[in-house]
């Protein structure tokens, strides 16, 4: 074996050792633990949470929305400061539901499990909102971004949520 082949072989072995997962990395919570089966289960769990959020939003109950957020969840509506943590998120949704009654449907445009405990979902929603202060129903359409975090109990919850309207402003 020539010196060139020995160097090449040593480099290949070095790369293999560097890329091989350590036993601790193959445990729960590592990228190495992600398989097609676990990703499929995770996607199903995220879709379940999205459906629950859609129902909770249309139901207008903060108590139904809150369990879908992580303890450190952040709600970032347009033209408002971020609501950080469950108590702030609860206060923000109380205000939203005080003014608006939703009849919307979310459509998932993109769902990506990025790591064993993190995923994002890009959605579009459309329907109507009844504005109590105006006494009228208006068309509603938004694009949304959800960042999900899997809890120790295996449930996927909303860690971050923001949206922007896609309808032009009312005149």
Regions found by a protein language model. Name each.
Residues 10-21:
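Bacterial N-terminal signal peptides
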Residues 27-30, 141-169:
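Short beta-strand edge/turn micro-motifs at domain boundaries
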Residues 53, 65-66, 73, 85, ...:
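Hydrophobic pocket/interface hotspot
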Residues 70-101:
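Short solvent-exposed beta->alpha transition segments
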Residues 27-71, 170-171:
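Short, low-complexity N-terminal intrinsically disordered segments enriched in polar/charged residues
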Residues 22-26:
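Sec/Tat signal peptide C-region and signal peptidase I cleavage site
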Residues 2-12:
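Bacterial N-terminal signal peptides that target proteins for export
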Residues 91-134:
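Surface-exposed, charged secondary-structure patches
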